[in-house]
């Protein structure tokens, strides 16, 4: 019964709409100007304000200093008996605390309660510009403390930025973090926890085992060793860094000399966010050293990571022969992780290597060459040794030249759309199928007008592209040509002629390619290339029907009259964009959508504009919404959930690699193509982020806690939304606020509600992944560590899942629509009538804001 009830709840939920917070001037702002009075806050005022703010949902995670800062921004308002304070249905922008008097609350013109001193109202207005759920009128003369949303959220942003920058400065000063990357240091900064100590309170005690690093942000602390005062630490000092690396007793006692605040980092949280610090530091050193090598810099990133993982790390005392020319057997390369070593050739010193330096390129390139050097430690040191076995395990063989050759081919073909999403197996088969051919100066490699069947990559030399006897350009090493011949039987559009002697090319024949690439992937590639090749103008499009409708306009099914190729045309009303102040968002949506190039993300063909609309011409996706699909399927099986969640992960991972946060992930924004594979659509909420974003945007039920709290967020918010989607797939309803329409109550449940699971959900791996995706602390959320999506892909939930086959379209989707399915089917005449009405009102447009559209 519980399963049926929850399935019913999930099926009955309405489609959820995104919200955009903005700080436009409202009627409420105008009203408050008439009641504002200047008044200095007394200590009892500040105490009351602080108490009220601490009980406020949005302020629940703020520390005392942040609460005090916000208190200082509260303004004083005076009302006479009968004065209106806020009105039900109007957009709100203030949060209030009653200082004196009584205020009546009305819902739908019915009085429901009276509030007095210390009570607060308008909490939702601090989050975004939602409509007021009640009217409040002064019953008696009274006064309020109030703060405007824009001031409140700007203050939160300022406090958050200041705190992050200050903590990051402290992190930069800790020597143990010197070898970390910028991204890794930012991860640690986000993991900092502020701890306050009273004067005389012990921070760490000599002899105790510790796992926390402390950095003094405020105050002073005294260091004692064996009860003897050694020194006083001040702001910026740090202690306990060895606790992050080693499990050993504290070497001193440290006591707060005055009220002291410390930024603290514990080993457990650091391991979650970054991994074992010592391992990370050594891996960074090894990777950087390998990238400096003339040999290893030609390896792929994955191969370098594998080498770092398989390298043997050893400690050596001072004055020790680490490698002797007469005794070395399998070691081919060394990297100094700590300390210094001296390098000898024929007993003559030829140099000193310190941390981060490496040696051995010649022995890697020619592994049969005897080791002629001796390496001796000058001090205690730690060395990474790369052996023949390490190289063989990493590369699959000991032939370095062949491996570099393979890497070159792979890096070239992965740049091309038709090869980019091949499975590893398909990619390997394709590369193995390449053959080598040579040409002399003046030889025709391909002839204009002939039907081609080969694809070429230039291994060495130069060729000329000639069309109608006119030289167009010259191609050189690692350039390619003729790829269309693998998909289409069509004449070559130009000739390719060898420019010099001994031009070497790798080539593969169409017959071989078609043996490797078959079925859904081949069909997908053919359609994608054909769509991109077609040149489309607005007047060449003819509308067939309306297939979607939203806040800003409609989506039409159109066809290109010359070629009959069908597309989707998203028509966005300029009036709606201007009225809702979304000019920057629509420009950003165009920029992001134009750059996207992934099989699980909607493909933009081009954009148009006229006096009334912006137009996005995209590929046509005919399989309906995932929202409807999961209702047809019922509660998803594990394999079905793996398919859909895995597909969404690949799309979101692609965006995050480009520093794009999507911010509105939900089944309504995912379509299914005719093969049953996903397409992520609608980038109206997406944003490119370098640091952190602060705007409240997205669909409330899918919003991460950090979006609501207003202290800054990044790509972690999409990981939270993955957890909401997975819960919906497996459990039925939404995990937070499923039965709520009041946005404040939805937000309250997201921030404080308990995550529970129906009794019929028994798979422990599924439950564990949902819990870890829906971790309220972003730094503890799976997928948000330095490993990124790898941690999610490696989770036991996906233990039997083939990611390679998913990317290669070799899996059977849970649902393939038997006919074309769209979100809407609206009569075209109805839309045309509305468009005609639109002409009657002039646009309040800004000059040239859309000039680049």
From Swiss-Prot:
The keyword Nucleotide-binding applies. Activated by cGMP. Not activated by cAMP. cGMP binding allosterically triggers a conformational change at the alpha C-helix of cGMP-binding domain 4, which bridges the regulatory and catalytic domains, causing the capping triad, composed of Arg-484, Gln-532 and Asp-533, to form and stabilize the active conformation. The cGMP-binding domains acts cooperatively to activate PKG. Optimum pH is 7.0. Residues 832-853 have a biased composition (Acidic residues). Its cofactor is Mg(2+). ATP binds at residues 547-555, 570. Coiled coil: none annotated. Changing residue 484 to A: Reduces affinity for cGMP and severe loss of kinase activity. It is found in: Cytoplasm; Endoplasmic reticulum membrane. Residues 827-853 are annotated as: Disordered. One of its GO terms (biological process) is protein phosphorylation. Residues 295-398 are annotated as: cNMP-binding domain 3. The cNMP-binding domains 1, 2 and 4 bind preferentially cGMP. The cNMP-binding domain 4 binds cGMP with the highest affinity and is highly selective for cGMP. The cNMP-binding domain 3 does not bind cGMP but is required for cGMP-dependent catalytic activity. The cNMP-binding domains 1, 2 and 4 can bind cAMP but with less affinity. The autoinhibitory segment (AIS) interacts with the active site and inhibits catalytic activity. Belongs to the protein kinase superfamily. AGC Ser/Thr protein kinase family. cGMP subfamily. This is cGMP-dependent protein kinase. It comes from Plasmodium falciparum (isolate 3D7).
């Amino acid at each position: 019964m519980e399963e049926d009830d929850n399935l019913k709840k999930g099926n009955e939920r309405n489609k959820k709409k995104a919200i955009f917070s903005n700080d436009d001037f409202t009627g409420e702002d105008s009203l408050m100007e008439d009641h504002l009075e200047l008044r200095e806050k007394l200590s009892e005022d500040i105490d009351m304000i602080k108490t009220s703010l601490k009980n406020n949902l949005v302020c629940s995670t703020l520390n005392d200093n942040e609460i005090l800062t916000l208190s200082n921004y509260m303004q004083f308002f005076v009302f006479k008996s009968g004065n209106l304070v806020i009105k039900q249905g109007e957009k709100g922008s203030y949060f209030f605390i009653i200082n004196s008097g009584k205020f009546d609350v009305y819902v739908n013109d019915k009085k429901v309660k009276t509030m007095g001193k210390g009570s607060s109202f308008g909490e939702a207005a601090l989050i975004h510009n939602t409509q007021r759920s009640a009217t409040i009128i002064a019953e008696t003369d009274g006064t309020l403390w109030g703060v405007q949303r824009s001031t409140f959220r700007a203050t939160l942003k300022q406090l958050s930025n200041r705190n992050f920058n200050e903590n990051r400065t402290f992190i930069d000063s800790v020597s143990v973090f010197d070898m970390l990357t910028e991204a890794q240091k930012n991860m640690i900064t986000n993991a900092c926890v502020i701890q306050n100590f009273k004067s005389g309170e012990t921070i760490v005690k000599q002899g105790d085992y510790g796992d926390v690093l402390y950095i003094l942000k405020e105050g002073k602390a005294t260091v004692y060793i064996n009860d003897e005062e050694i020194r006083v630490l001040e702001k910026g000092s740090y202690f306990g860094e060895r606790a992050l690396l080693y499990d050993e007793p504290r070497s001193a006692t440290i006591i707060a000399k005055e009220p002291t605040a410390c930024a603290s980092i514990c080993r457990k949280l650091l391991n979650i966010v970054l991994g074992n610090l010592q391992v990370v530091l050594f891996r960074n050193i090894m990777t950087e050293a390998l990238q400096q090598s003339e040999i290893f810099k030609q390896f792929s990133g994955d191969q370098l990571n594998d080498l770092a993982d398989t390298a043997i790390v050893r400690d050596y005392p001072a004055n020790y022969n680490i490698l002797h020319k007469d005794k070395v057997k399998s070691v081919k390369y060394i990297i100094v992780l700590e300390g210094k070593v001296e390098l000898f050739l024929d007993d003559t010193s030829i140099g000193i290597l310190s941390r981060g330096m490496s040696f051995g390129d010649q022995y890697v390139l020619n592994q049969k060459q005897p080791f002629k050097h001796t390496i001796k430690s000058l001090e205690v040191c730690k060395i990474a040794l790369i052996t023949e076995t390490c190289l063989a395990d990493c590369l699959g063989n000991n032939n370095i030249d062949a491996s570099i050759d393979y890497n070159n081919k792979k890096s070239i073909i992965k740049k091309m759309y038709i090869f980019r999403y091949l499975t590893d197996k398909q990619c390997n088969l394709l590369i193995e199928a390449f053959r080598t051919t040579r040409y002399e100066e003046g030889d025709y490699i391909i002839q204009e007008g002939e039907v081609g069947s080969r694809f070429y990559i230039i291994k060495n030399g130069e060729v000329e592209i000639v069309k109608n006897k006119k030289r167009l350009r010259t191609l050189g090493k690692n350039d390619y040509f003729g790829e269309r011949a693998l998909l289409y039987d069509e004449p070559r559009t130009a000739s390719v002629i060898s420019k010099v002697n001994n031009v070497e090319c790798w080539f593969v024949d169409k017959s071989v390619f078609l043996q490797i690439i078959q079925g859904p992937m081949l069909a997908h590639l053919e359609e994608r290339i054909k769509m991109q090749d077609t040149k489309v103008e607005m007047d060449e499009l003819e509308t067939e029907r309306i297939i979607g409708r939203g806040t800003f306009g409609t989506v039409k099914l159109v066809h290109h009259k010359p070629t009959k190729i069908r597309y989707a045309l998203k028509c966005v009303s300029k009036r709606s964009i201007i009225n809702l102040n979304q000019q920057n968002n629509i420009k950003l949506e165009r920029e992001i959508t134009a750059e996207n190039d992934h099989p699980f993300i909607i493909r933009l063909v081009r954009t148009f504009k006229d006096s009334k609309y912006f137009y996005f011409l995209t590929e046509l996706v005919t399989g309906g919404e995932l929202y409807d699909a999961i209702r047809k399927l019922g509660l998803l099986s594990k394999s079905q959930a793996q398919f859909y969640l895995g597909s969404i992960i690949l799309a979101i991972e692609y965006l995050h690699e480009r520093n794009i946060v999507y911010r509105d992930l939900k089944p309504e924004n995912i379509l299914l193509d005719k093969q049953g594979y996903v397409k992520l659509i609608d980038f109206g909420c997406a944003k490119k982020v370098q640091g952190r974003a602060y705007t409240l945007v997205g669909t409330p039920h899918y919003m991460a806690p950090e979006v609501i709290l207003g202290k800054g967020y990044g790509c972690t918010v999409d990981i939270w939304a993955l957890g909401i989607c997975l819960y919906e797939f497996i459990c039925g309803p939404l995990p937070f606020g499923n039965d709520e329409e009041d946005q404040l109550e939805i937000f309250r449940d997201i921030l404080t509600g308990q995550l529970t699971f129906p009794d019929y959900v028994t798979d422990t791996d599924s439950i564990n992944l949902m819990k870890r995706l829906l971790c309220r602390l972003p730094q503890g959320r799976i997928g948000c560590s330095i490993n990124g999506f790898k941690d999610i892909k490696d989770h036991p939930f996906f233990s039997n899942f083939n990611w390679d086959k998913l990317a290669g379209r070799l899996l059977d989707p849970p649902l393939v629509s038997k006919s074309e399915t769209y979100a809407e089917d609206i009569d075209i005449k109805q839309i045309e009538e509305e468009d005609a009405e639109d002409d009657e009102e002039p646009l309040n447009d800004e000059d040239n804001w859309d000039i680049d559209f």
